[in-house]
From Swiss-Prot:
Stated role: In nitrogen-limiting conditions, when the ratio of Gln to 2-ketoglutarate decreases, P-II is uridylylated to P-II-UMP. P-II-UMP allows the deadenylation of glutamine synthetase (GS), thus activating the enzyme. Conversely, in nitrogen excess P-II is deuridylated and promotes the adenylation of GS. P-II indirectly controls the transcription of the GS gene (glnA). P-II prevents NR-II-catalyzed conversion of NR-I to NR-I-phosphate, the transcriptional activator of glnA. When P-II is uridylylated to P-II-UMP, these events are reversed.
Pfam families: P-II
Top-rank lineage group of the source organism: Bacteria
Alphabetical keyword list: Nucleotide-binding, Phosphoprotein, Transcription, Transcription regulation
The protein's assembly and partners: Homotrimer.
Any one biological process term the GO annotation gives: biological process involved in interaction with host
InterPro entries reported for this sequence: N-reg_PII (IPR002187), N-reg_PII-like_a/b (IPR011322), N-reg_PII/ATP_PRibTrfase_C (IPR015867), N-reg_PII_CS (IPR017918), N-reg_PII_urydylation_site (IPR002332)
Protein name as annotated: Nitrogen regulatory protein P-II
Source organism (scientific name): Mycobacterium tuberculosis (strain ATCC 25618 / H37Rv)
Amino acid sequence: MKLITAIVKPFTLDDVKTSLEDAGVLGMTVSEIQGYGRQKGHTEVYRGAEYSVDFVPKVRIEVVVDDSIVDKVVDSIVRAARTGKIGDGKVWVSPVDTIVRVRTGERGHDAL
């Protein structure tokens, strides 16, 4: 099993969610976050004054999937989140040793 973590622009979330459902993902965790990479920050104007905003709003999506669909899920996220502009985000894959469904006590693949 693998944990797939994606950091994407907030306005792409609906497209990514639909794409993940089409890829067979049954559930996900979504968190609103802030950060910066090469994009750095941006400037905004408020009441005529320009302000530098160091952190950019992003969305973190986390899904645990079976090894057999990892590439399909990663490709689905990338396709749905790509705008071609700087700041589109990142996707990474981490190993998951075990998973337990709290309600039933099921473990491993049965808990997915």
